[in-house]
């Protein structure tokens, strides 16, 4: 009740009561639609590639000065910096998809999307998020997004958001995963098999 009360007071929590209440990546929404989920996740990182199910080939992180702890700049400078760092020397066209943070808020979804458009221009990778299905799980959301990326790579199956239609579908080789925390702390991870 406390966390829901806080999010409601900030006016970021969804007031919809249906199965798809979190409408992340729905750029036509007129109200915030963030919904909480609950999850736990763990992973094992190793410098050795033996028995690895995936490889992290790039890591990026950045922060930005914000006017409040829940805000983000209109072009998500923190995401621009973290994505550029994670992509590194890879060609932009080699990034097949992005699992976006996309919390379901008008500002959060739009600013991250703007950052993606600034980095990739007219050649956007396929975009998705898992929050329409599992809600925002706070600290676990980044790991769940990483898990989604790995599952899509392993199965060569892109899991699309019902609210955003991608124009192309291609073989999945490299997927970028974005996450951001309150206060403008962004992380991007490039993953491949």
Report residues per predicted region.
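Conserved beta-ketoacyl condensing-enzyme motif
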Residues: 1, 92-110, 120, 174-175
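Conserved beta-strand-centric core segments of catalytic alpha/beta enzyme folds
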Residues: 1-51, 139-193
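Condensing-enzyme catalytic core mediating Claisen C-C bond formation in acyl metabolism
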Residues: 18-97
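Short, catalytically relevant binding-site loops at active-site mouths
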Residues: 61-63, 103-106, 134
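Short glycine/threonine-rich loop-to-helix capping motif typified by GTGT followed
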Residues: 68-75, 104-120, 139-144
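Extended C-terminal subregions enriched in glycine
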Residues: 131-140
